[in-house]
Amino acid sequence: YIVWIKDGKLLNTTDSDQVTASAISEIIENKQSSLQTVVQIDKTRPLLLSENYDTEKNTELQSYIFFSKGRIRALDYGTWFHRDKGKTYGRQFTNKSLMEIYSSIGYELFEQKGDVLSVKLMLNTIQPPENIDFNTNITNKETDAKLYSIDFIVPKNQSDSLYSKMLRFINENTPYTVSLEKRVTPCLVLKRTSGKDKLATKGGTMIDGFLKSPSVLQNATLAYMISALNANNNTTSLPIIDETGYKGKVDLRFSNVKDLKTLQKELAQYDLALEQTERPLLMLVIKDK
């Protein structure tokens, strides 16, 4: 935060983005200031709930919703959890793109169904897609206007339904609809080609270096490999599904995991195959209304 002082008097408090040549000239030349006052907001309490509420001793907040579009300068870009006794009964996102909010909510909803959400399982059909999915690190009026902030709190005994209710609320109050749908989708399936165990770890320190060169997994589960392959499209744009049924920890080494053909060839030494097929997969589908 920046404090503006002139002639020994406090003029304003702002964020650093407002420190520009034109803003400084306005102050020096005693012109009408375009500065927007920024006062730090406490994210640990319900977002923008008046402190007057704290003086009411005979009432207890049961639920709370705050939802806004456009950058809030007094808040950072991030997220916050409202928790009690290990249960999350509220979630806060500040200055995020809708895609970032959707993916975080989707991750929780997929986990509740025993699945793992990846970028390859998110289908953005919005036109143009940049309305909800853009680089939030670029700060300008256009991107600031597309940022959203939400604080969504449910009664503590309804914590299990937090994310489904949160998504429903966002669907009702934006021009878009997000749903979890099973769709038959092209994918790559990891399979074992024999009953011989060529995967079992010899022990030692757990190493997750799958995306490095050379690629190394030591004393780790296959889930590390699947997660890394699904994290981006560097190896393939297709989702990777594990159908090996192998639950133990493994030792694996590859020369170049960014080249699909090389990876498939080197998987064979462990009696593994990565084959293209189709499967009904749970997808996070985002549509215009």
What are these regions (language model features)?
Residues 10-31:
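Non-catalytic, surface beta->alpha helical segment in thiol-disulfide oxidoreductase systems
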Residues 30-289:
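Beta-strand-rich assembly/attachment modules of structural machines
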Residues 1-13:
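A short, hydrophobic beta-strand/beta-hairpin element that forms part of a small beta-sheet core
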